Structure formats: C-alpha cells, structure tokens
C-alpha cells in the first residue's frame, strides 16, 4: 500500500478529548508562545476548562494575551473557561523539594538539596529536576480539562521532559549518603528543636518516587500527553526540531504535530516561476539612481515654478521608473527568501510528512497579539494547506 502524507493541520489534536497535557516547544524566536496561546484559545471552544502555563523565563504569554499574569491561574479576558499562569523566575524556590510535611516551620525551610550539597555534585541537574518534580506534582492536582505548556527554548524543555530519569538516578544515589542523611537530620533537629526521624525523611523520598513514576507514565501515554514542535524554514530551526523529535522518541513521548511558522506563500496565487523578473532587469535596476522620490512627487507648480509638458512627462517617467525599481527590489528579496525557505520546506516534507501532521502557517502581516488575532491564528492551525515548495529549476539543455 502506498504511504500517504498526514493532513497538515492540528484538527486531530483539537478533536482528541483524552489529551490532558500538551507541550509546545522549539527553538527561541519561532513562534512557540503564539502557537501555544492559539492552541489554548482554540481548545477553549470545545473543552470545559483550559489552562496555559508558561515555563519560559521570558514569559511572553502576557504579551500575547495583552494581560498580566502571575504564578497563580488567572482567567483570560474574553473567556469564561481559559486560564493562564506564569511560573516566575523564583520557581526553583517556589517549587523546591521542601520538607513541608515535617513538624515545624524551621524544618519546612530546609530542602533536600540544602541538606545534601554533595548530591548536587554527584548528580548534576538534580536541583532543577527536583523543582520540575514539584511543579508537575502541582500540575497533577489541577482540575482542568487540558493544560497547555508554553515551554522555554529546546535545551530547557528537554531537561524538563527528562527529569523523571534524572530524578530516579538521584534518588538511587541517596542510598550512598545514608551516614550524611543521619548527620543532616541531627543538624536539622538541633536547629528546629524537633525530633525528625529518618522514617519521616524516607516517607518524603517515597512520595517523590511515586510522583516521578506517575509523571513518567503520564508523559509516555499518547492518549494523555503530546508534544507540538514549532519551527521556521531555516537551518538552525530545522536542526533543533530534528534534535527535539529524536529526544522525544528516546523519552517515549508522543509527538505527532510540527507547526512550520512564518512561511512565505506565492503572492496572490501567482506561480513563482511565472513572475520572476529577468536577471538583466534586476541588474539594471540595481545600477540606476533616479532623482529623490520627494522631488518626483512634488510638481514644480507646488513650489511656484513652471513646468513644461516635456518636463512633466520626463518627471512622471522617472517617478514610474522609481516605483518599478522599488517593486523589483522587493520582488528580488521575496524570491530570494522563497527559494531559501523552499529548500528547508522540502527537507521538512521529506523528513516528517508521512509520520507527522506538518502544519505550514503563512507569514503574518502584523504581530499576533490579542484575542482576535490569536483566534485567527488558531483557525490557521485548524485548516489544511500544502507546503509551498518551489518546483525544481529546469535543467540546462
């Protein structure tokens, strides 16, 4: 049976009611936040309650919705079922592994990583993994129909998704610190005036293991969790997308959708090969320097001077020529960028079109901010259009 390309839209994602967690990520500057906000707004049309969480320190969802958000869910203006929150720059303090179930306020101010600094050296990144664990434990307790994660650029996102494995290694490493744990608890007891037993500490560790296991299971359940990659048709973005796709496969996290943003489509439906200006005409346009546009637009009569019919005709010819040169320069830039994008669109099609929903989004004429524009962007995500790949150049005879 012949393989068929998957439909180029997010329609299937929007129509999957079992999805609870949708991560949106990619290289910085490709439109992750616009896409995640548009996805959340689109889901709000059919889901009972939707939450979008920004884990990106840049926190652009406030800019996208033109509304300030904090680290608690806030209703988005214009909706009755869409909420947003931004994990602030202190989230490692906010969500650090506090020993909050221990008996005193002084004890609660201690964290696992402050008690065992050696663990930070033995397992690099364990402090961030502990923060992610606490964050995801909070997320698991939230009663929203679906949660959309606007993630940080690729490297940070990969660390977040890999935290269950890292944390599991860290917890195994704890067994080698038994004597140090006992000493740390003695110090904590001396400071707090309480008697914290080793089994209290062990209970916290077991709870953390349970969180790690449940989050891993949720991450690896394609009916529960999926990842939407966002890229643009340029080298670095396509490279990072492939890196992200490979890592998601390694982590057994579903990824079935790739949004290709900022794509130039043929202008007015005209085929590219039929509207390319001749190279000789472009070269002559580059060489010409007509009179300044201001002079050509202002007739001498406006300055109290006389102009003969011959002078007027010459001025108008120069004005038309000046406009031609400007249009040719724009067209030259357009075709150059179309050709560059087409090469990477071809790569994207070859790599992903049979296993992923590849969704090309046209370059927008204005910044996508505010509910109305985000909803229009969401409609683009829901509709299908082919990748605008240029036909191969005719071979020379």
Swiss-Prot record:
The species is Toxoplasma gondii (strain ATCC 50861 / VEG)
GO BP of this protein: tail-anchored membrane protein insertion into ER membrane
Assembly:
Homodimer.
Protein family per UniProt: Belongs to the arsA ATPase family.
Name the lineage: Eukaryota, Sar, Alveolata, Apicomplexa, Conoidasida
What name does the UniProt record give this protein? ATPase ASNA1 homolog
Keywords recorded for this protein, A-Z: ATP-binding, Cytoplasm, Endoplasmic reticulum, Hydrolase, Nucleotide-binding, Transport
Can the keyword Zinc-finger be found in this entry's annotation?
A: no
The places in or outside the cell where this protein is found are: Cytoplasm; Endoplasmic reticulum
């Amino acid at each position: 049976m012949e393989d068929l390309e998957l439909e180029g839209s997010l329609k299937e994602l929007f129509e999957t009611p079992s999805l609870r967690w949708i991560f949106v990520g990619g290289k910085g500057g490709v439109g992750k936040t616009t896409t995640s906000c548009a996805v959340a707004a689109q889901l709000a049309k059919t889901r009972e309650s939707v939450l979008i969480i920004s884990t990106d320190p840049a926190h652009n969802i406030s800019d996208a919705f033109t509304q300030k958000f904090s680290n608690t869910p806030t209703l988005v203006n214009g909706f009755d079922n869409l909420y947003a929150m931004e994990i602030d720059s202190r989230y490692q303090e906010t969500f650090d592994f506090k020993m909050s179930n221990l008996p005193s306020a002084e004890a609660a101010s201690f964290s696992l990583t402050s008690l065992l600094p050696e663990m930070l050296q033995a397992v690099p990144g364990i402090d961030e993994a502990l923060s992610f664990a606490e964050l995801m434990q909070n997320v698991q307790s939230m009663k929203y129909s679906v949660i959309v994660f606007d993630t940080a650029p690729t490297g940070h996102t990969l660390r977040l998704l890999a935290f269950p494995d890292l944390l599991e290694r860290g917890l195994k490493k704890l067994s080698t610190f038994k004597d140090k744990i006992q000493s740390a608890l003695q110090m904590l007891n001396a400071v707090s005036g309480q008697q914290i037993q080793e089994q209290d500490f062990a209970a916290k560790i077991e709870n953390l293991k349970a969180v790690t296991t449940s989050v891993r299971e949720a991450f690896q359940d394609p009916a529960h969790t999926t990842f939407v990659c966002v890229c643009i048709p340029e080298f670095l973005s396509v490279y990072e997308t492939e890196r992200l796709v490979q890592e998601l496969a390694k982590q057994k996290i579903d990824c079935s959708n790739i949004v290709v943003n900022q794509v130039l489509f043929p202008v007015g439906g005209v085929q590219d090969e039929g509207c390319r200006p001749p190279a000789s005409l472009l070269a002559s346009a580059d060489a010409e320097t007509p009179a300044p546009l201001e002079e050509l637009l202002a007739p001498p009569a406006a300055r109290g001077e006389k102009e003969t019919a011959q002078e007027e005709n010459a001025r108008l010819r120069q004005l038309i020529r000046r406009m031609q040169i400007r249009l040719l320069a724009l067209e030259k830039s357009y075709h150059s960028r179309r050709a560059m994008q087409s090469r990477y669109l071809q790569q994207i099609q070859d790599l992903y079109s049979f296993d992923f929903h590849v969704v090309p989004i046209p370059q927008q004429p204005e910044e996508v901010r505010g509910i109305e524009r985000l909803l229009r962007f969401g409609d683009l995500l829901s509709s299908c259009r082919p990748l605008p790949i240029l036909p191969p150049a005719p071979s020379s005879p």
